[in-house]
Structure formats: structure tokens, C-alpha cells
Amino acid sequence: MATQFQGSAIIRLNGKEWPSDNDGTLTPGGKERETVKGSRVYGFSEKPTEAMVECTVFNCAETDVMELQNITNATVEFETDIGQVYLLPGAWTVETGTLSADGKIKLKMASIECKRVQ
């Protein structure tokens, strides 16, 4: 039997699926490690990093780029086609929305944490 590998993901904000391109990415966040070295390597230090979802939303009559860029305290879901579901609670938009001439909006959301819920 062949193993199925991920080929796409669905992105939802507050339970609503947004029509998005297949370029979505999930960065779970956590800790970023940096090597500590001087005259030799001593170990590493850690800094916290935010969880992040980035995607391209297709513009339509129901989509408002200004609404998207002003999102705060949202619940973001990243659901893969192999059944994995990740949740970013209390998420906010990181950058202003950019609407291109071909109707695409770049969206970047961050959160304090990322939880795998399925």
C-alpha cells in the first residue's frame, strides 16, 4: 500500500475557509537556537519565536484586504490533506495586506503558539 504525502492545505480564520493558493506555509514557532562560540564552540542559546501562517488569498466580492490586514485575536487553522490540523489561537496580521492586479492578497499571520489538534 502506498503512503499518502501532503499535497495541499486549507486555511481558516475564525472557522471560515478563505479561498487560497496552494502556497500556504506553517511555521510552528517555539525556540530559535543560536550557536554560542568564541575561541571555541561553547553551546547554544535560545530565544522564543512566534508561530506563523503565510498564504495567498484570492480576492473576490466577499474579500476585504483592509479587513484582513486589521485582524487581531483570530483563530487560524492550517489543515493538511493528510488529516493534520494545526491551530494558532489569538493570531494577528503581521504585515499590511498587498492586493495585486491579478487579485491575490499576501497574508501573514502570527501567534504566540501553535498547537496540533489532530
Swiss-Prot record:
Superkingdom of origin organism: Bacteria
Ranges for region Disordered: 12-32
A Pfam family per the record: Tail_tube
Family as reported in the entry's similarity comment: To phage Mu protein M.
Protein name: Mu-like prophage FluMu tail tube protein
